[in-house]
């Protein structure tokens, strides 16, 4: 960077080169940092703070102090949240004191590493920094007094660069504040000058699982968590894979449409950041190259993960309500409203009937215990089965169950049958000896329960003890006690809790409401018992399905 004053265009040329110099230091642009193939590279960075968390002390490990910043520069899309960087220090008083988003920040000696398929930055022990105020602010009070140990000495070149970065940042944010929306009738072009080809758009009624699709839609409902942003969108076309919204199942905030017209979209990373700041209910959006999949309840949903390398050119953008591409959506919306006014009672009656025929084994939601770790007291053999959810199993088509299916679930035990351990072994047929036979009601993170049967050799494999054998347990209290101690490893004090509720004349299912039993992986075989020569697939019903445990051992 020379002595002459440069403008925004020249700054963009410097950044687009990927690597550039200011004074004696060489810097890496944010986008090139995110795309570096060689990880654990030490770089210097210069950008705008797009988000941050104040410094705090870690409660575990070395108990270092840490602050997290998201650094942005013009090589990133406007909607991108930038590069995540964790700054660590043994002392809490020598980390940057950031007051607000928009401040220019220079970081010296940052290590880039790969984490969960994305790049993030970590500070080295000797890292240093320089921080400027938000120059677009009327007051320079946006710069707090900074701690001296890591503060870099900078000159006019660095301040000029910071000023230009802040100017471009201010221009980009003002575009959204003033409602200057991107015209979607032309190809999109980002700040780096890369233009993308036109995209093929679909109606929501045409999308299917496991594809990438693009569509226009109206935002019906939004909410967010610490991790992501969720919205429901519709183009007023119907898809049989969508969740059937009705006045009985949707929240009071749901204003329609009712039926299978709306799809849930979960947004992460830069898409999350963009929607939190610029999208509200009622807005029209264009979503490009989003991924579709079946959720844990068996319904279609859309996912937008971070895509800093632009491999898929995924995006969500607000669209001006006067765009001609929205005319058909508005027309279908008017027709939907008119039809509802003419026959809403019939629609509600139809939907309520469909809700009454829901799967009988899907339980009411209980207060979920967070999964901190999987117990070491359970192993599975073989270890090749793919992890799935109970809801996915319950919503699988019956006609595909001509052969048994095997699943791996991550669950906790919330109930069992019989209620007395003395009945866990029964006489075999013909009555010559005893065999194990009992069932565990398990629940996974989707808050759905499944009854899993353990019989004979599969149950013996679960118990996994030569000292505990099936017998008339009522006549062998010592054997029953050993069985109780063995099962304690997978269900904790659940048996005592259930017996406590039974002794008080209460329902034993109350024990499952705040259960804190261990989490573990269980193998389940799903099948329909063959009775006679049944080949009529149409006669199969959900209540014929069975689930048996296998390949699971307590150790």
Curated annotation (Swiss-Prot):
UniProt keyword terms in alphabetical order: Chromosome, DNA-binding, Nucleus, Telomere
Localization annotation: Nucleus; Chromosome, Telomere
Pfam families linked: POT1 (PF02765), POT1PC (PF16686)
Assembly mode: Self-associates. Interacts with ccq1, poz1 and tpz1.
UniProt name for this protein: Protection of telomeres protein 1
Protein family membership: Belongs to the telombin family.
Alphabetical list of SMART domains matching this protein: Telo_bind
Chief location of this protein within or outside the cell: nucleus
Example GO BP: telomere maintenance
Function: Single-stranded telomeric DNA-binding protein that is required to protect the 3'-end telomeric overhang. It binds the consensus sequence 5'-GGTTAC-3'. Regulates telomerase and telomere length.
InterPro entries membership: NA-bd_OB-fold (IPR012340), POT1 (IPR028389), POT1PC (IPR032042), Telomer_end-bd_POT1/Cdc13 (IPR011564)
One GO molecular-function entry: single-stranded telomeric DNA binding
GO cellular component, one term: chromosome, telomeric repeat region
UniProt keyword annotation of DNA-binding present: yes
Leader peptide range in chain numbering: none
